[in-house]
């Protein structure tokens, strides 16, 4: 995602007075959580607003070269969405945007997908983008049976490392279904995300 006027939270902030003058009472956001896609329905990290919508304060690394499908080579993307400075700055900026929306008497609705996540999700980490980070992240369930997120997903066989036998939404391996029946932790984690958004 490149910067473009109106396509990020700064664009929304810049147009709030205009929206208020139009009589807008509610602003509905598609998912804003970290995700590799434009639509963001394949959430990678429920704890943070995507820096591509929020703030990128640390930016370095390489883009994926044409024809290269190994996402571990997309170091610019990885740095943007795994560095705490970018993630925290984006959450803080979103809180500011919500505060400004509320100051104008408008409400906010945030869309999110809680049935499934994306294969990039730090709990699954099928794309191995959290593997080599600075020990800030636990190994994903795709990588290791011992992952603390193992029960967040339903696996059909014991084929670690890189177990591709998990349940996906409509069978899509890029959209791993979350295993609410097998994990109280995933329910708790989502409840925490809901509470964070409700506090804004």
What would you call each of these model-derived segments?
Residues 197-200:
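N-terminal low-complexity segments that are often proline-rich with Ser/Thr-Pro
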Residues 1-17, 21-25, 32-195:
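Substrate-binding/active-site clefts of carbohydrate-active enzymes
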């Amino acid at each position: 995602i490149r910067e473009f006027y109106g396509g990020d939270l700064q664009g929304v902030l810049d147009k709030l007075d205009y929206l208020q003058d139009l009589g807008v009472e509610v602003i509905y956001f598609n998912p804003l959580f970290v995700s590799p896609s434009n639509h963001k329905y394949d959430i990678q990290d429920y704890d943070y607003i995507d820096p591509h919508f929020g703030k990128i304060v640390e930016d370095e690394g390489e883009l994926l070269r044409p024809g290269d499908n190994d996402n571990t080579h997309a170091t610019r993307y990885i740095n943007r969405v795994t560095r705490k400075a970018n993630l925290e700055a984006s959450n803080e900026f979103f809180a500011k945007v919500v505060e400004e929306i509320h100051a104008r008497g408008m409400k906010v609705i945030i869309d999110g997908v809680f049935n499934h996540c994306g294969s990039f999700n730090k709990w699954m980490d099928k794309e191995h983008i959290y593997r080599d980070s600075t020990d800030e992240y636990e190994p994903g369930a795709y990588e290791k049976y011992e992952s603390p997120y193992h029960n967040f997903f339903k696996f059909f066989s014991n084929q670690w490392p890189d177990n591709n036998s998990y349940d996906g939404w409509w069978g899509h391996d890029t959209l791993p279904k979350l295993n609410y029946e097998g994990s109280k932790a995933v329910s708790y984690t989502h409840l925490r995300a809901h509470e964070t958004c409700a506090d804004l």
